[in-house]
Amino acid sequence: AELTPLDTTYEITEGNNLVSWPSHSSCSVGDAIPDEFEENICGVIGEGVAAIPNETFGWVGSLQLFQDGKGYWLCSDVDMYYNWDAANCEGTLSRKAEQSAAIPSGYEYKQSTEQAFYFIESIENIEMGDWILSYNDDVVIGARQWSGEITDVPTMGDDGSEYTKGYIKSGVAPSFKILRGDELINLEGDIPAFE
């Protein structure tokens, strides 16, 4: 398949913009986004993965590598002309994205075209290996294993398809639970509405 040329310039508007990764080589988020644009990028979302900039840790979240043939939603704070630093990654060994741990049986969910991510910095008494589950009423709409650092929890919305019936709608706040072994622990907090 033909890729977008490496020197493609995108006209980015404030908000979310769909862009493609123009290289056969995978590239880390921090290497792929040129330094001169980083302060204007508020996040990047892929299929079930996301990353946001963090002043202390750099790029955090489950999106570690941009991959050949994939599209991404790039969130910008401003209108700008943008280009990837894909040449920075050319000729390097193609790395594979880390595979996420398999979601425990009974807590699976379907990918939706309507998705949001909740970035969680800390939870009292959470342990490595625990899962953070997002819910709409009693329907599981997302899951991510706690990584010990800032963890992005995907939350799927109702996109009108049969697969997402019962998923969350815009303006409603999800609930979150910790899954530890077979035990579900409700989480309390000020949770923003799904958008």
Task: Specify the residue positions occupied by each region the protein language model found.
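N-terminal exported-region signature
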Residues: 1-195
